A protein has these predicted regions:
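Short, Asp-centered acidic motifs that coordinate Mg2+ and/or phosphate
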Residues: 40, 80, 160
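Beta-strand-loop-alpha-helix segment that lines the small-molecule cofactor/substrate pocket
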Residues: 80, 86-87, 91-138, 153
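Contiguous beta-strand/loop segments that form the cofactor/metal-binding neighborhood of enzyme cores
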Residues: 197-322, 336-341, 350-416
Length: 416
C-alpha cells in the first residue's frame, strides 16, 4: 500500500438495499467498536429507503444520489468504499474508487469477465491500494484450518473436491432486480447464474481448497459442464460440472435453483486416506474410512459475513489478516467465463417441468432432479451419466491458455 490509513477507517457505502443491508450492518458493527467511521453513502432509491437514509443523515452521514458525486464530494476524505452492487458495476466502480485513492471491498464475484478483473488488478497496482472480494466463507478460520489439513496431507493425497448445493428459488427471485438470471444488462456482461451468485462462495471454496499453496486457488486445465434452464431466464439455473486441475485434482459441482429439496451446501474433500466434509453453517468433519474422527463448528452466516469487513479493517490498520484479493478471485471468474463461452445452455422441455404455487411464490421444478442430483454426486458423475431423461452430454474442453472472455456465448438448446 502507498501509505497507512488512520486508525479510524473512513468508509463510504454504495447501496443499502438487498445485499447492501449486510454491508451496512458490517460497517455499523465496525463503527460500534471504534474501528470505522461512516462518512458517506450512495443511495439511488432514496424514496424506497427513506427510513435508512433519514437515520444516516441524523447520524451526520451525507447521503448522495450518485456514485460519482459521492467520490467527488469525499475526495481525500474516504479510505474505503464498500460496493455491494450489481455484477455489471463491480469493475467500473472498483476502478473509479481506486483512482479516487480509496481501498475497496467489492461483493462477489469480483467482476463478470476476466478482462474486467485484469483491469482491477492493474488499477490496484497503480493506486497501491487494497481490493478485497466478498467471498465470505474464505475469511473465517475454518476455511484455513481445512486448507492447512489438506496441504499437510492429513487425509492423504487430494483426489477430489465435490460441491452439492440445492436452493429452490421462486420466479420472483429472478425479477428482484435488473440483472438476476441475465447474461447482459445495462450494456455490460453480468453472467448471473447459481455458480456466479448464490453458490459462488462454494465453488470458490472448492477452488481454494484444491489450490497448491496456502493462499492460492487451483488452476483448472480441463472443464466438462452441463448447463440447464428451467426458469424463463437468459442464463442457467441448474448445473453439473467436472473440472481437472493442473495438480490432477478433480472438482465436481452440482447445483440447482429448480429442484424440490432444499439442503445446506455441502463440500466433500476426498483424499486417498480419508475425507473432510464441510456443511454450510453447521460443521466440518474429519473422517477416515467412513468413521468420523473429529468435528468442528462452521460459523453462522451472520458471523461469516461480519468477518469480511472485520478482516479488511484489520489489514488496513496494519494487523495480520487474510483477505480475498483480485488474483485469488480471478480463478472463479475464469471458470465462469469458460462455462458461458464453451458450453451451451440446455432449455428443459415443459414435459420435464412441474409448476407449483406456494407461499413464497411460483416454483418451476425439474421432475426427478433431486434424485438425479443425488445419484450424480454419489457416483462422481454428470447428469448425463445418470438416467435423467432431460440430460445432454457435452465434450470436455481444454482451458490451456484460456485467459480472456471472447464476448460470445454458445446458443441455448431445447431439451426435448
Amino acid at each position: 500500500m502507498r501509505d497507512t490509513p488512520p486508525a479510524l477507517i473512513r468508509a463510504a457505502l454504495v447501496g443499502v438495499s438487498g445485499y447492501g443491508r449486510w454491508h451496512l450492518l458490517m460497517a455499523m458493527e465496525q463503527a460500534l467498536v471504534g474501528r470505522l467511521q461512516f462518512v458517506g453513502a450512495t443511495v439511488i432509491n432514496q424514496a424506497e429507503e427513506a427510513v435508512i437514509c433519514d437515520r444516516l443523515r441524523r447520524q451526520g452521514v451525507p447521503v448522495f444520489g450518485c456514485f460519482d458525486e459521492m467520490l467527488a464530494a469525499l475526495a481525500g476524505r474516504v479510505d474505503l468504499v464498500l460496493l455491494p452492487t450489481g455484477i455489471q458495476w463491480h469493475a467500473p466502480m472498483t476502478v473509479a474508487a481506486l483512482a479516487a485513492g480509496a481501498h475497496v471491498l467489492v461483493e462477489k464475484p469480483i467482476a463478470a469477465t476476466l478482462q474486467e478483473v485484469d483491469r482491477i488488478i492493474a488499477a490496484q497496482a497503480a493506486a497501491q491500494r487494497l481490493v478485497a472480494v466478498g467471498f465470505q466463507d474464505l475469511y473465517v478460520p475454518a476455511a484455513h484450518d481445512i486448507k492447512r489439513r489438506v496441504l499437510a496431507g492429513e487425509r492423504g493425497t487430494l483426489r477430489r473436491v465435490t460441491v452439492r448445493a440445492q436452493w429452490p428459488r421462486p420466479e420472483g427471485y429472478f425479477s428482484r432486480n435488473t440483472w438476476a438470471g441475465r447474461l447482459r444488462t445495462d450494456g455490460a456482461w453480468v453472467l448471473d447464474s447459481p455458480v456466479n451468485n448464490a453458490f459462488a462462495h462454494f465453488l470458490m471454496l472448492a477452488l481454494f481448497w484444491a489450490g497448491a499453496q496456502p493462499e492460492t486457488a487451483a488452476e483448472v486445465v480441463q472443464l466438462e459442464a452441463e448447463l440447464y434452464r428451467a426458469h424463463v431466464i437468459e442464463s442457467f439455473d441448474t448445473v453439473s460440472l467436472r473440472a481437472r486441475t493442473a495438480d490432477a485434482v478433480e472438482i465436481l459441482f452440482y447445483g440447482s435453483h429448480a429442484g424440490c429439496e432444499e439442503r445446506p451446501p455441502e463440500i466433500r474433500i476426498t483424499g486417498d486416506r480419508g475425507e473432510i466434509t464441510w456443511i454450510y453453517e453447521k460443521a466440518y468433519t474429519i473422517s477416515r474410512a467412513g468413521a468420523s474422527l473429529e468435528e468442528f463448528a462452521v460459523p453462522s452466516q451472520l458471523d461469516t459475513r461480519l468477518s469480511v469487513l472485520e478482516s479488511l479493517v484489520a489489514r488496513l490498520r496494519g494487523e495480520p489478516a487474510f483477505i480475498v484479493g483480485p488474483e485469488l478471485a480471478r480463478a472463479h471468474t475464469r471458470m465462469m467465463n469458460a462455462l458461458h463461452e464453451l458450453f451451451p445452455i440446455n432449455v428443459i422441455g415443459q414435459e420435464h417441468i412441474e409448476v407449483a404455487q406456494e407461499t413464497d411464490g411460483i416454483f418451476r421444478r425439474i421432475r426427478h432432479l433431486d434424485s438425479s442430483l443425488a445419484e450424480a454426486a454419489r457416483r462422481n458423475a454428470l447428469f448425463s451419466e445418470t438416467d435423467a431423461p432431460w440430460a445432454i452430454a457435452g465434450d470436455a474442453q481444454s482451458l490451456d491458455g484460456y485467459e480472456s472472455f471472447a464476448r460470445c456465448c454458445p446458443p441455448s438448446i431445447s431439451v426435448g
